[in-house]
């Protein structure tokens, strides 16, 4: 399998899922967009696209002009080529915008280890049918996808009290996942070094919030790693058919 990974900051990669892909011998091509990497002109060689999180937001095209091209290439991969896509956090929001939604500020920001509740359509979904009806996942976002109701090719799979579109899919090959289960033991401390992430965390919980958040994440790490393993296994068998 050949995978193209769109990254917006080096420390936000597919994490635990990346380790699983490497163990399976998959060929990974990482495009570090914030560092000036360009998306290849020809996407035909890639079986899968991952689109990860980042400290910028989808509307920041003037500050980050590469976002314009990124959205075009996601549209090409998902809508035109109809190839498998997984988008996490910012990647989820980029997919949402590409398929006709709007990305708006969350009220309030969603930060912490929080509940995600699956909906009825989860039971017949290829990726998430074996997940429990409620899971704990790491949230660290201040924007979210809205206004996808009129797109009949969108299925809403999971929500939280703050964010309606925690998981949605376009047709049956492209998924937006607003939360994080792909994290590892070092993730929270690594992300806490990013000024935008740290300020959002401390604005909500005060000074010293990072240490508490890290401890809470590690207490839930085994479960999130298990969910990542299930997601990856189902992605291989049900979406890629391997």
Annotated model-derived regions:
Residues 11-16:
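Short N-terminal binding/cap micro-motifs at the start of the first secondary-structure element
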Residues 19-85:
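Flexible gly/pro-rich beta->alpha loop and the following alpha-helix that scaffold active-site loops
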Residues 78-102:
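Catalytic nucleophile loop
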Residues 100-186:
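Pocket-forming structural segment of enzyme catalytic cores
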């Amino acid at each position: 399998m050949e995978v193209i990974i769109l990254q917006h900051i080096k420390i936000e990669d597919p994490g635990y899922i990346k380790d699983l892909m490497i163990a399976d011998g998959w060929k990974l091509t990482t495009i570090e967009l914030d560092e000036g990497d360009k998306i290849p002109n020809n996407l035909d060689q890639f079986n899968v696209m991952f689109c990860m999180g980042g400290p910028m937001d989808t509307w920041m095209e003037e500050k980050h002009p590469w976002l314009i091209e990124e959205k075009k290439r996601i549209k090409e991969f998902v809508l035109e080529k109809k190839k498998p896509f997984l988008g996490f956090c910012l990647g989820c929001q980029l997919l949402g915008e590409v398929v006709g939604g709007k990305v708006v500020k969350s009220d309030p920001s969603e930060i912490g280890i929080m509940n995600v509740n699956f909906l009825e359509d989860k039971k017949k979904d290829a990726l998430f049918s074996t997940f429990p009806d409620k899971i704990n996942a790491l949230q660290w976002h201040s924007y979210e996808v809205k206004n996808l109701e009129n797109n009949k090719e969108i299925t809403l799979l999971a929500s939280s009290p703050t964010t309606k579109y925690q998981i949605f899919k376009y047709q049956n090959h492209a998924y937006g996942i607003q939360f994080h289960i792909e994290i590892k033991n070092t993730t929270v401390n690594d992300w806490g070094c990013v000024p935008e992430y740290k300020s959002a965390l401390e604005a909500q919980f005060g000074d010293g919030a990072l240490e508490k958040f890290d401890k809470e994440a590690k207490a839930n790490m085994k479960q999130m790693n298990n969910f990542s393993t299930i997601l990856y296994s189902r992605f291989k068998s049900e979406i890629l058919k391997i």
